[in-house]
């Protein structure tokens, strides 16, 4: 990795990040092998509370695999993942369920239920948690629609929504329980530039309004530059670069330049 030294592997509770408060996420020496293929080759990464981190890299380079590890949807071959001071590796499903309450996920597709209205989709996590009061559900959904700038859309079905609207509904559903952290899997994928820009603004607004920590997996460099406090470049299963957008743009490293300019030169993830 360039521009910043790698984080050391640890076996105790993660330390706080100087000047940025406590650590929301800390990944230590994370490895994942599927068959004979090494997907993750020793990831060391830390995300401060309230920070927005963008993870960039070539398609098939392990970005989404890393994201799934952060919520326990995949188990690593080796390494540790700490969420707010708790090592989630080896946790039971019940324990992981408690961790997942702290984390919202926006999947690339939005993952809406086709048979449910917008209101029902957004309220789904609350119903799953046992909330049954119609007034409470309507009030919380209305708040989310206001945040998403989708007032009056609660009775629509997903099939009638544009791609950008589906993303907003998916995001509203993922944050309705006020998680500490939101994970975004390619949030602007398949959107035109204007709609993508509106999603980027929304990600920043959520950080500012609710203080949410965000991890944004993307291959959209404009999105990464727009939303991120810090950018991590995943290359060949490792964090090759970890720094600010300015540091990334000013880097003369040939591997980074190839990625930014879209050149392959026989290299890739």
List each language-model region with its residue ranges.
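Conserved ABC ATPase signature
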Residues: 157-161, 165
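Catalytic Walker B motif of ABC-type/P-loop ATPase nucleotide-binding domains
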Residues: 182-185
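Short coil-to-helix segment of the ABC ATPase nucleotide-binding domain corresponding to the Q-loop/switch region
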Residues: 116-124
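Helix-to-loop junction immediately C-terminal to a conserved catalytic motif
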Residues: 71
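A short, proline-enriched helix->beta-strand linker immediately N-terminal to the Walker B motif
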Residues: 176-180
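Conserved ABC ATPase "signature" region
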Residues: 86-87, 134-153
């Amino acid at each position: 990795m360039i521009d910043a030294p790698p984080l050391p592997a640890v076996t105790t509770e993660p330390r706080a990040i100087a000047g940025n408060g406590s650590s929301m996420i800390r990944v230590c020496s994370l490895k994942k092998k599927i068959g004979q293929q090494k997907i993750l080759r020793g990831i060391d990464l830390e995300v401060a509370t309230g920070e927005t981190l963008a993870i960039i890299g070539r398609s098939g380079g392990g970005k989404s695999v890393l994201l799934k590890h952060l919520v326990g949807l995949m188990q690593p071959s080796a390494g540790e993942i700490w969420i707010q001071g708790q090592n989630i590796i080896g946790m039971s499903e019940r324990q992981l369920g408690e961790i997942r309450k702290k984390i919202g996920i926006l999947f690339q597709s939005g993952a809406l239920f086709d048979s449910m209205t917008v209101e029902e989709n957004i309220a789904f996590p609350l119903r799953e948690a046992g909330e049954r009061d119609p007034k409470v559900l309507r009030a919380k959904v209305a708040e989310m629609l206001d945040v998403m700038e989708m007032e009056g859309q609660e009775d629509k079905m997903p099939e009638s929504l544009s791609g950008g609207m589906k993303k907003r509904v998916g995001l509203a559903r993922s944050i309705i329980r006020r998680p500490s952290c939101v994970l975004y899997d390619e949030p602007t994928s398949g959107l035109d530039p204007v709609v993508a820009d509106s999603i980027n603004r929304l990600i920043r607004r959520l950080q500012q309004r609710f203080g949410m920590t965000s991890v944004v997996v993307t291959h959209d460099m404009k999105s990464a530059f727009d939303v991120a406090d810090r950018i991590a470049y995943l290359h060949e299963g490792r964090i090759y670069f970890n720094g600010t957008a300015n540091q990334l743009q000013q880097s003369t490293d040939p591997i980074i330049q190839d990625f930014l300019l879209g050149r392959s030169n026989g290299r890739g993830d």
